[in-house]
Amino acid sequence: PPPPLAFRSRARRGLEEPGSGLVGTVVVAPDLGGSLVVVPGESPAPGTGTVRSVRVEVEAGLPVDGEVFAAAVLATLNDPRGWSVPDGVTFSRTAADDASIRVVLASPATTDRLCAPLATESRYSCGNSVTGAAVLNFERWVLGAPDFGDDLATYRQYLVNHEVGHVLGHGHEDCPAPGAVAPVMVQQSISAQGCLTNGWPVP
């Protein structure tokens, strides 16, 4: 297997931006074994509409402050630019087993196992409307994607919104025209297809 990727905490611009949850020396280990830890905590849904409860899980061994990560996930989902307007939803946080959505941060190999039969190639993430799980690949959380450059904060918001978008039933979209703002369901982890990168359903 490839050796772990390691970064000093400030080796890349944006690595420790608020909401990343990253702590200390950040090592991207290929496989941490798959033990998932539920981040404790609850918060009510702040908006109107259909309430979707969200449970946040972090794989044991990741250099992540789970509470900071969970708060960032819920802040992204409940942002006015998020899914609340187009889908009429609002998101609460729970640690209960009956959560309607699970957001999981996992090592590349664990992501592959959780996303199967979809082939994520240890590089990508997934969201599944049947299982209710949005699995975020930790390597992507740390490295971002080429078209986003150093804008890791926006990429992380994109990653949450895109994969939870799948959980909500949204499929992939294409860039409508070169230079246009990319719909959030474009596979921007691979390429923005000539569009401007965007992390939000309603930018």
Describe these PLM feature segments:
Residues 1, 6, 24-29, 124-146, ...:
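Metalloprotease/metallohydrolase-associated module, dominated by Zn2+-dependent proteases
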Residues 1-51:
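N-terminal low-complexity, Pro/Thr-rich disordered segments
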Residues 48-63:
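Acidic/histidine-rich, surface-exposed loop or edge segments in extracytoplasmic proteins
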Residues 58-59, 105-108, 137-139, 170, ...:
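Active-site-proximal beta-strand/loop segments in catalytic clefts of secreted hydrolases
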Residues 63-66, 112-113, 193-195:
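Short, solvent-exposed loop/turn elements at domain surfaces
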Residues 67, 71-155:
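Metzincin-family zinc-dependent endopeptidase catalytic domain
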Residues 75-84, 167, 171, 188-191:
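Structured segments of extracytoplasmic/periplasmic soluble domains
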Residues 153-171:
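Active-site recognition of the HExxH zinc-binding catalytic motif
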